[in-house]
Amino acid sequence: KPRPHQFFGLM
């Protein structure tokens, strides 16, 4: 599962 910090990395 992708972690919250990974979502921020996409942006």
Curated annotation (Swiss-Prot):
Coiled-coil zones: none
Span of the signal peptide: none
Main subcellular location: secreted
Gene Ontology CC terms: extracellular region; synapse
A Gene Ontology biological process term: chemical synaptic transmission
Key word Ribosomal protein present: no
Known function: Tachykinins are active peptides which excite neurons, evoke behavioral responses, are potent vasodilators and secretagogues, and contract (directly or indirectly) many smooth muscles.
Record-given protein name: Substance P
Lineage summary: Eukaryota, Metazoa, Chordata, Craniata, Vertebrata
